[in-house]
Amino acid sequence: MSLIMLQSCSSSKLSVFSKSYSAEDLKIEKLDFDYLTIKSKIQFKETHKTTKATALIRMKKDSIIWFNLSGALGVQGVRAIITKDSVKIINRVEKKYYLYDFDEVSKEFKFPIDFNLIQSMIVGDMPKPLDNSNSIKKSGEQYIIKQNIENIRITNLVNLQTMKLVEVNVTEKETDNSLKLLYKDFKDVNGQGLPFSIFISLIHYNEFGELETQLTINHSRAEASDKPLRFPFSIPKKYEAQ
């Protein structure tokens, strides 16, 4: 009798975890905004080096990400504007500027990076949209969404109660380089949940082994609005291109 009950429970448990869901079954909460202003504390950590700064971030959804850094030696006076096709950075202390397309950014970080990925990292949305080609299953208190898109594999973890994204793991197939995103401390912004604590880990490999870059972002204030924001950015003629 005990054996039969055990087998019955195991069979029942297996069916719960093996059930698949469609994209229409999930109503994952996405941050809806026209313009967004965020003030954050950031910490950037590489091998043997940690940099801290305060960031003022302004965004126009799906179009512009602008930020200004202050408070730390080496990043004081750094301003950047990110659009769909480029990243522009000026350092007003060193009087230098940098212009990149996303192929160059991806090469620098040894991982495929685009505008949508950066935007999703800041607001806690899925980097790639959900569709019926994705594998969707439920495990414990989370939905597990697996995506296989061109040269990357993505695993998204969504909280069952809040329907908010809490973790993303992205792996580049060819190199095995990986990106991990963790979202915590969700707070209300215009009736929607925004993660105020974000941890980003980027791992790549070279001839010496594994190298990790970490970025921690802690928002202190966030405001969504339908009123246009300013994104001041200009490069003085006397600045040197790098």
Identify the role of each PLM range.
Residues S106-K146:
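Hydrophobic, well-structured mid-protein blocks that either form specific transmembrane helices
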Residues M5-S8:
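C-terminal motif of bacterial Sec signal peptides marking the signal peptidase cleavage site
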Residues T50-T54, V75-R79, K95-Y97, R153-T155, ...:
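Short, mixed charged/polar active-site loops
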Residues F44-K49, W66-L73, M121-L130, I144-E150, ...:
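Short, solvent-exposed secondary-structure boundary motifs
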Residues I65-N116:
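An acidic-aromatic
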Residues S12-S86:
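Start-of-domain marker
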Residues S135-Q242:
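Gly/Pro-enriched, hydrophobic low-complexity segments
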